[in-house]
Amino acid sequence: MYRWLVRILGTIFRFCDRSVPPARALLKRRRSDSTLFSTVDTDEIPAKRPRLDCFIHQVKNSLYNAASLFGFPFQLTTKPMVTSACNGTRNVAPSGEVFSNSSSCELTGSGSWNNMLKLGNKSPNGISDYPKIRVTVTRDQPRRVLPSFGFTLNSEGCNRRPGGRRHSKGNPESSLMWKPQEQAVTEMISEESGKGLRRPHCTVEEGVQKEEREKYRKLLERLKESGHGNSVCPVTSNYHSSQRSQMDTLKTKGWGEEQNHGVKTTQFVPKQYRLVETRGPLCSLRSEKRCSKGKITDTETMVGIRFENESRRGYQLEPDLSEEVSARLRLGSGSNGLLRRKVSIIETKEKNCSGKERDRRTDDLLELTEDMEKEISNALGHGPQDEILSSAFKLRITRGDIQTLKNYHWLNDEVINFYMNLLVERNKKQGYPALHVFSTFFYPKLKSGGYQAVKRWTKGVNLFEQEIILVPIHRKVHWSLVVIDLRKKCLKYLDSMGQKGHRICEILLQYLQDESKTKRNSDLNLLEWTHHSMKPHEIPQQLNGSDCGMFTCKYADYISRDKPITFTQHQMPLFRKKMVWEILHQQLL
């Protein structure tokens, strides 16, 4: 009797189901009111709906009630929404009621349906309080965690699937979810309260950081070894403490290791640091102040600038150093008391210094002419590294060898051996003490192979007819010098870092004993011979980690003339330039 009524109602229901307005138009119109990081939730329906949508749901509710009244098996895909009395928003039934006709096994076993699991608190209008992250887990794909940039979708954006289930349809403009072909389980994970979204972690960036940390760790280990080892050169120079210079150093722009023409000297060159070089006490104090976190006063900055400018020009600082520093420091009442004490020590040393010694220092600092400066600049400039610039004493000095004389570079064996031969030639011509100099490779050969390994090194030379014998010592990354004075029967070890060389002196003394037996058929009276290491206060000390080779050469220069060693660290830039010119012209200034 009522079959015609059922057919009419079914026709109306199908018509209403097809006339649902499109969801994209609503999304484009409501995009400004959407939350950026809200997720696709099939159970959430926005509070405001178009009037046509409300009319359709009212028709559906009426049909649902009519079907229930007559007892016909009429099923809807969604249950009627209940309007909240407090804020007018619509709340839907729990997700478990949406899939009321499906079992849990069927839900998890299907390869095309998603399981929406929600964590975290929700506000009364059905929107999560915290931002969510979409987690996609597939059987054949690794787990991926991607932030959800989708907008909140309306219920019309969900397509009806067989069996009364709904499948969420993502927004192609905003969703970043990769859809695998295999089964996927989507989880909605709420972040902790108050933390918000974190910056995505980049695997490549992590690898770069690990690589930089590894380089930095190796550099620190090397510097630590050079600072505490017995046979290496401690680095005491002041580097820029800013983070920018540290990163430049870790990126291998500030440090480099080279090998020049197969020689054994490692070129570990700091290329980008600047050092204000003054006398020992003042410079050591400035080093302490740089390491501290306190501020440097303006007067100290002015003094440092003045010292740096004059050291670059190669002027002498000792005669008026105390007056300049004391005058500058008295300008400010807040000067450091420790700095005053250091300056007073310098003043005392300057007063005790004789006029002749000051004259000697002045004679050492001969200014270079413009032509000499140009020639030096050309040699240190760009050009083929294997270009031979000077050849003598069976040695060839290339442009690469000369460029080790740049500021803050380490000298190699070729440069040191060439300069030592220039000292021998100078002593022969100018009537200085008879001098013999061993090669830088002599001591390593003697230490490793004994006397028989170097027996022929003195063929045609009688060492005991000489007055002074110089032996350059290379200890891994540090240069030093041993002076054998046959007139006084003593051996002296000179190290610009204050290290001791008793073992080195003993090896060389034993070599003299073997040489005396071979050449003179007589033993040395070892009781008459003495050896000791020069203490730091007895000879000038380097204030950086790159001038050990220069100090070794200048030790040899002064000692070969029986001249007191009076040079200082701040003269090294000028000495380097002079040495370039001397090697090019094969003549000492």
Swiss-Prot record:
Main location (coarse class): nucleus
Region Protease: start-end pairs: 396-560
GO CC terms of this entry: cytosol; nuclear membrane; nuclear pore; nucleoplasm; nucleus; PML body
GO biological process, one term: protein sumoylation
This protein's UniProt keywords: Cytoplasm, Hydrolase, Membrane, mRNA transport, Nuclear pore complex, Nucleus, Phosphoprotein, Protease, Protein transport, Thiol protease, Translocation, Transport, Ubl conjugation, Ubl conjugation pathway, Wnt signaling pathway
Post-translational modification: Polyubiquitinated; which leads to proteasomal degradation.
UniProt-recorded Gene Ontology molecular function terms: deSUMOylase activity; SUMO-specific endopeptidase activity
Assembly behavior: Binds to SUMO2 and SUMO3. Interacts with the C-terminal domain of NUP153 via its N-terminus. Interacts with MTA1.
Protein name: Sentrin-specific protease 2
